[in-house]
From Swiss-Prot:
Gene Ontology terms for molecular function: lipid binding
Assembly: Homodimer.
Lipid-anchored residues (N-palmitoyl cysteine): C19
Cleavable signal peptide: 1-18
Function: Involved in the storage or transport of lipids necessary for membrane maintenance under stressful conditions. Displays a binding preference for lysophospholipids.
NCBIfam families per record: PRK10477.1
UniProt xrefs under CDD domains: lipocalin_Blc-like
UniProt keyword annotation of Lipoprotein present: yes
Membrane-protein topology: Lipid-anchor
Protein name: Outer membrane lipoprotein Blc
Lineage, top ranks: Bacteria, Pseudomonadati, Pseudomonadota, Gammaproteobacteria, Enterobacterales
Translocase found in the keyword field: no
Family listed: Belongs to the calycin superfamily. Lipocalin family.
Amino acid sequence: MRILPVVAAVTAAFLVVACSSPTPPKGVTVVNNFDAKRYLGTWYEIARFDHRFERGLDKVTATYSLRDDGGINVINKGYNPDREMWQKTEGKAYFTGDPSTAALKVSFFGPFYGGYNVIALDREYRHALVCGPDRDYLWILSRTPTISDEMKQQMLAIATREGFEVNKLIWVKQPGA
């Protein structure tokens, strides 16, 4: 019996399931009365849970713009100081239901989608707390490269209340930080 085809099939099935869940984690509430047009533009990544696709990157930003098909273009960019170069990835996002609810699915790789859920957002759309499909993905975003200690504590309190292990956050090096 050849084991390689079996391993490949199991791996492919795992990737489809792991990367296609666009729902928020159980018990986590996403933002309602969401206005996607106000969310568009550039956001600075203030903190994140560490993952291989962003490991070692500084000066990380995410820029969102409208797509012709009603979705949202996503451009993530970060500086890799070890390689002394910028890295960029482009993706697309779509609402999983009502666009006034901040639950989206995002893809950076073909047909594979993962959750992008805005779980906290200030009235001015200047600070956001975003999670993925489970509690292993969390980001604190801001329209500016730095945030106040007060805003940092607010975001940490919300993340803790929603069941995220905030001690796992890494704080991203940004200009002026």
